[in-house]
From Swiss-Prot:
<dbReference type="GO" id="GO:0051539">
    <property type="term" value="F:4 iron, 4 sulfur cluster binding"/>
</dbReference>
<keyword id="KW-0934">Plastid</keyword>
<keyword id="KW-0249">Electron transport</keyword>
<keyword id="KW-0793">Thylakoid</keyword>
<keyword id="KW-0813">Transport</keyword>
<feature type="transmembrane region" description="Helical; Name=VI">
    <location>
        <begin position="368"/>
        <end position="394"/>
    </location>
</feature>
<dbReference type="GO" id="GO:0009535">
    <property type="term" value="C:chloroplast thylakoid membrane"/>
</dbReference>
<feature type="transmembrane region" description="Helical; Name=IX">
    <location>
        <begin position="574"/>
        <end position="595"/>
    </location>
</feature>
<keyword id="KW-0560">Oxidoreductase</keyword>
<keyword id="KW-0603">Photosystem I</keyword>
<feature type="binding site">
    <location>
        <position position="669"/>
    </location>
    <ligand>
        <name>chlorophyll a B3</name>
    </ligand>
</feature>
<feature type="binding site" description="axial binding residue">
    <location>
        <position position="661"/>
    </location>
    <ligand>
        <name>chlorophyll a B3</name>
    </ligand>
</feature>
<feature type="transmembrane region" description="Helical; Name=III">
    <location>
        <begin position="174"/>
        <end position="198"/>
    </location>
</feature>
<keyword id="KW-0148">Chlorophyll</keyword>
<dbReference type="GO" id="GO:0016168">
    <property type="term" value="F:chlorophyll binding"/>
</dbReference>
<keyword id="KW-0411">Iron-sulfur</keyword>
<comment type="similarity">
    <text>Belongs to the PsaA/PsaB family.</text>
</comment>
Length: 733
């Protein structure tokens, strides 16, 4: 008999029902649970998969480069970045029809998709200028992807499989990743900016043919060896520098100017190079801190074991954490996801507030798309961090090893943690909603002057302390006489104060009562999401109801009132609930960002300031008003180039709504439905010639919820993506 899927589980492969397929897919990545899996084999498989992951990333990037070089208009865009629309790729579709071909054709090009990903600005900033360079980059990445795939295969061969001891050698791995991965790669990137990108921004082409003969600075390496490093900061580009040409260009390569290049409204490349160099130095030093073969440096275990406050308030302190983290991949993954989630959210913020790429801040649709994209990814990563934290408690937590240390004490006072989060969420929820609906009511009854409007004083003070003069707080950097301001203008960031008080960029936007309210609405979402996730993780191993449910596993389902209390201790259900809260919270974040920016770009910030104080304002003046481009993608007079987003908007709603079919139902209904269909199938002539090997059974409760959640999530994100792109592109191109 042929072996059935899944090969990794004998028990599942022999299951006579369709469960075999779904459980097989569900546990394909749960490597720990596979037949015959040893700890060493587990580490080796995960390690090899990293090479595959990198290969996929490089392949994808190579695809972007290749398609833009082949079907895009990069060279034309480079000649006039503000007026030419960047093309992502051609659209090949015989079903188009005449009106669509007209709508999607730009000039004399065949129907195309416009790029809203920011790759044009990115490649331009780092020194690309021609299609040939894009092709070369694409081929280079393909070769790299092939090398990585080979490396992944190689590390699965018996001779080249690293041992378990190698994987658990924390100090060596830290040194290698800090110095090698983060330090040297930052140094290499600094080198690229200094040797290729900065010359390109000054009209000097540096390629493979001349990079060894074109010094990035006229003084060469002499100042470096003589210690006269200020030479590299002298003579920066002037304020009237025309980007990409020698006009107004300087010679500085490592500066501390602050603010933005007046023409491109992006950070000075020489500032970025300086920043990247500093990071390289810090990480290369950090990568020499830990004790490995030479008997010098720190030992992680000693540091953790020594962290025990003298007052005794933290019990055994960090004792046991070294072994706990070393031996738990879920704990490591949880920490990594949490850090990466925060970094991704910061990327969303900094990508528009301190734009690193030339002319990106003039491409409003791309800015909106990038913000939304990074914010959603951050949400998924952070929820994943807590999910793996919960799996850690179920599978990897050893109460003996962690006796009376900080981890055990967290678990012992979890009620206090959970209830404090609960109080914070309740306070934020009732007060914020109360203010909104009060304002809604008085506006609806024609008395808008009775709204309760708070000026965000503390936030304004923080902005003023950073140099924003409009609030007239006259404190720290917004006071012309403070020592910080005096030093700032002479030594560091002379361009900062000009930038923060310039209305042409996104640094510290002016805020008011609408911002105050939505800030607290977002705080409510963040606290509630955190509450659900923290409770799910802390109660994952057990609660008052069931002291230790280690053997029940992570996907222990919430079985409703029939089995009282099971919902209280299901980590899977906490993850499931938190996903909805996370998605809705990021909805509020992106609505806020998008609406505020739409009004600023349109020169009418007053619309946001007035309408954002009550919920009807959000529904009417943001969602409804901005959905007109989507509704008019098709109309009685034909169609326009937003029709594709109109389709996506409808399709997103459809997927989203399908999710509810799985979310608002119960298992018995599905089983009955399936058996009815099977009965009908078996009695229908011709149809009953087709048989199946597996007995059809309904999805389990947990599976149906997952299917529902996936539809809800995908539909939600697709719908909002279409809305953001079409509403912004409809107004601002």
């Amino acid at each position: 008999m042929a072996t059935k899927f899944p090969k990794f589980s004998q028990a599942l492969a022999q299951d006579p029902a369709t469960r075999r397929i779904w459980y097989g897919i569900a546990t394909a990545h749960d490597l720990e649970a596979h037949d015959g899996m040893t700890e060493e084999n587990l580490y080796q498989k995960i390690f090899a998969s990293h090479f595959g992951h990198l290969a996929v990333i490089f392949l994808w990037t190579a695809g972007n480069l290749f398609h833009v070089a082949w079907q895009g208009n990069f060279e034309k865009w480079v000649s006039n970045p503000l007026k030419v629309k960047p093309i992502a790729h051609a659209i090949w579709d015989p079903h188009f029809g005449e009106s669509a071909i007209k709508a999607f054709s730009k000039g004399n090009t065949y129907p195309v998709n416009i790029a809203f990903s920011g790759v044009y600005q990115w490649w331009y900033t780092i020194g690309f200028r021609t299609n040939q360079e894009l092709y070369l980059g694409s081929v280079g990445l393909l070769i790299l992807a092939s090398v990585l795939l080979f490396a992944g295969w190689l590390h699965l061969q018996p001779k080249f499989r690293p041992s378990l001891a190698w994987f658990k050698n924390n100090e060596s791995r830290l040194n290698h990743h800090l110095s090698g991965l983060l330090g040297v790669s930052s140094l290499a990137w600094t080198g690229h900016i200094v040797h290729v990108a900065i010359p390109a921004s000054r009209g000097v082409h540096v390629g493979w043919e001349n990079f060894l003969t074109t010094p990035p600075h006229p003084a060469g390496l002499t100042p470096f060896y003589s210690g006269d490093w200020t030479v590299y900061a002298a003579n920066p580009d002037s304020a009237n520098h025309v980007y990409g040409t020698a006009e107004g260009a300087g010679t500085a390569i490592l500066t501390f100017l602050g603010g933005f290049h007046p023409q491109t409204q992006s950070l000075w490349l020489s500032d970025i190079a300086h920043h990247q160099l500093a990071i390289a130095v810090v990480f290369i030093v950090a990568g020499h801190m830990y004790r490995t073969n030479f008997g010098i440096g720190h030992n992680m275990k000693e540091i953790l074991d020594a962290h025990r406050p003298p007052g005794g308030r933290l019990g055994a302190g960090h004792t046991g954490l070294f072994e706990t983290i070393t031996n738990s991949l879920h704990m490591q993954l949880g920490l990594a996801l949490a850090c990466l989630g925060v970094a991704t959210s910061l990327t969303a913020q900094h990508m528009y507030a301190i734009t690193p790429y030339a002319f990106l801040s003039k491409d409003f649709t791309t800015e909106a798309a990038l913000y939304t994209h990074h914010q959603y990814i951050a949400g998924f990563l952070m929820v994943g961090a807590f999910a793996h934290g919960a799996i850690f408690f179920v599978r990897d937590y050893d109460p003996e090893l962690n006796k009376n240390n900080v981890l055990a004490r967290m678990l012992e006072h979890k009620e206090a943690i959970i209830s404090h989060l609960s109080w914070a969420s309740l306070f934020l929820g009732f007060h914020t909603l109360g203010l909104y609906i009060h304002n809604d009511t008085v506006v609806a009854f024609g008395q808008p002057e009775k709204q309760i409007l708070f000026e965000p004083l503390f936030a304004e003070y923080i902005q003023a302390a950073s140099g924003k003069a409009v609030y007239e707080f006259n404190t720290l950097l917004s006071s012309s006489t403070s020592p910080a301001t005096v030093a700032g203008n002479q030594i560091w960031l002379p361009g900062w104060l000009e930038a923060i008080n310039n209305n042409k960029n996104d640094l510290f936007l002016k805020i008011g009562p609408g911002d105050f309210l939505v800030h607290h609405a977002i705080a409510l979402g963040l606290h509630t999401t955190t509450l659900i996730l923290v409770k799910g993780a802390l109660d994952a191993r057990g609660s008052k109801l069931m002291p230790d449910k280690k053997d029940f596993g992570y996907s222990f389902p919430c079985d409703g009132p029939g089995r009282g209390g099971t919902c209280d201790i299901s980590a899977w259900d906490a993850f499931y609930l938190a996903m909805f809260w996370m998605l809705n919270t990021i909805g509020w974040v992106t609505f806020y960002w998008h609406w505020k920016h739409m009004t600023i770009w349109g020169g009418n910030p007053g619309q946001f300031d007035e309408s954002s104080n009550y919920i009807m304002g959000w529904l009417r003046d943001y969602l409804w008003l901005n959905s007109s481009p989507l509704i008019n993608g098709y109309n009685p007079f034909g169609m326009n180039n937003l029709s594709v987003w109109a389709w996506m908007f409808l399709f997103g709603h459809l997927i989203w709504a399908t999710g509810f079919m799985f979310l608002i139902s119960w298992r018995g209904y599905w089983q009955e439905l399936i058996e009815t269909l099977v009965w009908a199938h078996e009695r229908t002539p011709l149809a009953n010639l087709v048989r199946w090997r597996d007995k059809p059974v309904a999805l389990s409760i947990v599976q149906a919820r997952l299917v529902g959640l996936v539809h809800f999530t995908v539909g939600y994100v697709l719908t909002y993506a279409a809305f953001v792109i079409a509403s912004t592109a409809g107004k601002y191109g």
